[in-house]
Every structure is written in C-alpha cells, then in structure tokens.
C-alpha cells in the first residue's frame, strides 16, 4: 500500500494542502467582489487535483507494465480507475464541506461548493481520459 502512495506523491501533497487551505480562515482579497469567485476557485482547485490524479495514475500504470506487475493486454481503463480519479476527488470535496461545517467556526459547509467541486472533477474527466491514454503509451 505504501509503495503505491509513493507513486502518487503530488496527489498526497495536494490532498494535504487542500485540506489545510480549506479549513483555515479566508483572508480578505480584492477578488471578493467577483461574483461566484468561491465557486470558480472550487472548480479550478478540484479540476486540477483530479487531473493530477489522472496523470499520476497513468504514470503508475506505465511503470507497473514496465516492471511486469501488470500484463500489457489487460485493460488499463476500468471501473477502479474511474473510482480513483472521479470518485475519490468528489468524496474528498464532500468530506471537506462536512469538516468545514463541523470543525471550524470560520468556515461553513456549502452544498454549492460541493457541486462546484464535482463540476471541477467532471471537467478533469474530459481532460484526464485523453491525458491518461497518452501517458500510458
């Protein structure tokens, strides 16, 4: 299990970074006047997070094939890959909203933020599939 996490170093770092940033108080910024800036931020943050996960999944798959841990003929694109690259980021976004609602006094959980997280993950799906197929080759 631990050796697999080493292949997903950037994803682990991003997970910890997103968790910390989402639980800290929000500083005032001139961008507060931009309508829906919070939702745009969630879409970009989780879209980027999911896309990095797609890239690291492809690189992990490629190294597994090269090391002989996985046969080349097996389908590399399957349900478990979608569960990892789509399911986990959406679940993580929901978990963050629950943590914001229950553990912080400076933040509040918001269903629209969760929806924005999911939209970001779906946008990453559109970019992630071709990226995955390119990197696995």
Q: Where do the PLM segments sit?
A:
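Bulky hydrophobic segments
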Residues: 1-137
